Every structure is written in C-alpha cells, then in structure tokens.
Amino acid sequence: MLELCLLGCGGMMPLPHRKLTSLMARYNGKSILIDCGEGTQVGIKEKGWSFKPIGVICFTHYHADHISGLPGLLLTLGNAQRTEPLLMIGPRGLERVVNALRVIAPDLPFPIEFRELKEKSETIEMDGYRLRAFRVNHNVICYGYTIEIGRAHV
C-alpha cells in the first residue's frame, strides 16, 4: 500500500505549525522524499515515520524553502548508520547545489547518487513503481512528480 504524508506546505519562512515544503511517500518498506524544506525532519518524527528507509530524494527546484532541510537530514541519516546509497533526483545543477549544502555534512557513511533531469518529461523505473518527472511552470526550471504503481497514479 502506498502511504503519503504532506510534511510541510509553507513557503519562504517556516511558522510554528507550518513547515516548509516536503512530501514523503512510503511503499514496500521504502520511502521517497519530494523536496526537503526546513522542518522536514520534525515532520517525519511527528508522523512517527523513520528516516532510514528514505532511498530517494526528489527536488522540484532549488529555492531555499524546498532544499534548506537537506544538510540536517543528511547528518541524521549518517548518524543512523546508513550505508546504502541515497539517490537524489532533480533539475540540472543538482550535484552542484547538493555539494554546496554539504559543507556542513562533508563526510557521510553512504554514497549519494545523482540523477539530473534534462527532458520535459522523464520516467524512472524504481523497485516496484515508476517515478515520472515532468516540467511545470515556475520562474525557474521546476519539475512535478508522479508515482505510478500499476495503473494507479499519485
């Protein structure tokens, strides 16, 4: 069963009861994170979900309210003794942006793999599902994501 949780939907500045943008999906014991705004870790803990099964982090774009929670999350994953690779998916510039944020998390016990999106629409075959990325209209290059399981799409 696919489980979804909107961890945050605020913009620009976190508020006490409104964290910045992030959504987590769980399927077959694995988790996907879409965006990682400030407060993402708090939202995951409030939901009672675990960090360790996060295998994929997708970014829609690189405004701060969508990426500012990443350094802390990487440190938390490292402290959880994660050794499995972490896949990150996002628009062009992904590796440069992530590596700039890793200044405070330079030594991690797991590798990070990067998949930069270049086409208007791309489908990525995952373990038991498909992740479809598609361009959306914004003032910077931006993607939306659909999780496809069989004939169901979310």
Per-segment meaning from a language model:
Residues L4, P111-F114, L131:
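Generic structural signal for residues in well-ordered beta-strands
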Residues P14-H17, D127-R151:
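Active-site-proximal loop/helix segment associated with metal-binding centers of metalloenzymes
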Residues E38-I89, E116-K118:
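Active-site metal-binding motif and surrounding structural segment of the metallo-beta-lactamase
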Residues M1-K47, Y145-I147:
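Conserved beta-strand hairpin/beta-sheet module of binuclear metal-dependent hydrolase folds
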Residues W49-K52, F110, Y129:
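Structured loop/turn residues at beta-strand edges in well-structured enzyme cores
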Residues M1-L2, E122-L131:
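Beta-strand-turn-beta hairpins that frame and shape the catalytic cleft
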